[in-house]
């Protein structure tokens, strides 16, 4: 997993981590008993189960290594009402059921503190169409799109969005079911692939340029990461995210200080527009004219060895164990 990172990766224009929050990173100097019994929820039944298992096991080990009474809880095998026997929840349940407001609503009903966003932001964030409609209504730049159906006029979609374009399931994460479409003839097949993952499918204008991700923790934008897939004509797909080792991650990201600050501010505005809380990630593109375009939000980001949140935290001087403690501490 090639990665460009220097010890001075912190952008001086970015919002700094405050002294008291930085001190929270000294996880091992604190009393782990303050958290009580912690359920680390991961696995589940969604198409992102494999990623959730990887993320959740990493988080579980990081918490347990610091003396926290943390236990794996898998909704696929356990009755979710049993969560009432815990004091708080670290949610690493990617995809439907864990990232779309369902788990958040249950935990609210049980009165359990939980990491991350609540019902509203989770439900909106898991719906790419609703997210983009909201951002557009707030005056935030997001790539043009159209909702597809079996009876869609494919030629009209191409006339409107141009080629290439990208087709996505509206309610999936981890780039599952996504396809780049280069010709009109490829569009129906891409629709079928995406429709096989869910009930709603969208096409989005292809933005030629550089891809970035912006990690947000405690309403602070961390150093921007530039993503460079080995195949620069393609996109940051599932294979590049989790299985390949030739994707490059650049910190510093190569933007000027002014551009990075602008992208961080845009991402914070997008994060707050959907009422997201705690931690998350915004994906964006910069086109060849230098304009930034919001793609989507992730309210339960990956925490695997390939994941972007740990990379951004590392650029802030925070190791993985400290990061997990810090996120869990948001529930206190």
Curated annotation (Swiss-Prot):
It catalyses: 2 D-alanine + ATP = D-alanyl-D-alanine + ADP + phosphate + H(+). Binds 2 magnesium or manganese ions per subunit. Residues 1-17 have a biased composition (Polar residues). Residues 18-28 have a biased composition (Low complexity). Residues 1-28 are annotated as: Disordered. Mg(2+) 2 binds at residues 296, 298. It is found in: Cytoplasm. Its EC number is 6.3.2.4. Residues 132-329 form the ATP-grasp domain. Keywords: ATP-binding, Cell shape, Cell wall biogenesis/degradation, Cytoplasm, Ligase, Magnesium, Manganese, Metal-binding, Nucleotide-binding, Peptidoglycan synthesis. ATP binds at residues 158-213. Pathway: Cell wall biogenesis; peptidoglycan biosynthesis. GO terms for cellular component: cytosol. Its cofactor is Mg(2+); Mn(2+). One of its GO terms (biological process) is cell wall organization. Disulfide bonds: none annotated. Gene3D superfamilies: 3.40.50.20, ATP-grasp fold, A domain, ATP-grasp fold, B domain. Mg(2+) 1 binds at residues 283, 296. Its main location: cytoplasm. GO terms for molecular function: ATP binding; D-alanine-D-alanine ligase activity; metal ion binding. Cell wall formation. Belongs to the D-alanine--D-alanine ligase family. HAMAP family: Dala_Dala_lig (MF_00047). This is D-alanine--D-alanine ligase.
């Amino acid at each position: 997993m090639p990665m460009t990172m220097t010890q001075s990766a912190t952008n001086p224009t970015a919002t700094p981590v405050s002294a008291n929050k930085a001190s929270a990173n000294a996880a091992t100097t604190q009393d782990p008993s303050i958290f009580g019994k912690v359920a680390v929820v991961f696995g589940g039944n969604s198409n992102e189960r494999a990623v959730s298992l990887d993320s959740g096991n990493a988080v579980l080990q990081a918490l347990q290594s610091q003396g926290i009474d943390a236990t794996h809880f898998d909704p696929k095998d356990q009755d979710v009402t049993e969560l009432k026997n815990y004091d708080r929840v670290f949610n690493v349940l990617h995809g439907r059921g864990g990232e779309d407001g369902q788990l958040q609503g249950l935990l609210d009903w049980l009165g359990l503190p939980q990491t991350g966003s609540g019902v509203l932001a989770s439900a909106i964030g898991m719906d790419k169409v609703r997210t983009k409609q909201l951002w557009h209504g707030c005056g935030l730049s997001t790539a043009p799109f159209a909702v597809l159906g079996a009876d869609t006029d494919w030629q009209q979609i191409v006339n409107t969005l141009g080629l290439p374009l990208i087709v996505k399931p509206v309610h999936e994460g981890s780039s599952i079911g996504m396809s780049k479409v280069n010709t009109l003839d490829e569009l129906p097949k891409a629709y079928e692939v995406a429709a096989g993952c869910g009930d709603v499918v969208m096409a989005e204008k292809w933005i030629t340029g550089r891809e970035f991700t912006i990690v947000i923790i405690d309403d602070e934008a961390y150093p921007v990461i530039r993503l460079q897939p080995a195949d620069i004509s393609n996109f940051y797909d599932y294979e590049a995210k989790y299985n390949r080792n030739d994707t490059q991650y650049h910190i510093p990201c190569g933007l000027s200080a002014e551009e990075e600050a602008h992208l961080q501010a845009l991402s914070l505005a997008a994060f707050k527009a959907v009422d997201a809380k705690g931690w998350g990630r915004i994906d964006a593109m910069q086109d060849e004219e230098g304009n930034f375009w919001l793609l989507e939000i992730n309210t339960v980001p990956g925490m695997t060895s390939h994941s972007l949140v740990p990379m951004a935290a590392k650029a802030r001087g925070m190791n993985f164990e400290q990061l997990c403690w810090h996120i869990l501490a948001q529930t206190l």
